[in-house]
């Protein structure tokens, strides 16, 4: 996820997001990539939904699930400029 991570970090910086938010969003993207076993750039909507369901099924707090959803939305809407 090296180049994609760098692009996402640059986009987060351009938006003026705090260091903590940038780290959190990048960690969310990394966790998603690890779950999928491949780059988020080649993953579709069903994998995103499956990952978010996985978070709920593993009893993550609703606020945590919301952060992951926001981070993935940023990744796809801003960095990749495409729907998942």
Give the positions of each predicted feature.
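Intrinsically disordered, low-complexity and often Lys/Arg-enriched segments
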Residues: 1-2
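N-terminal core-binding DNA-recognition domain of tyrosine recombinases/integrases
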Residues: 5-84
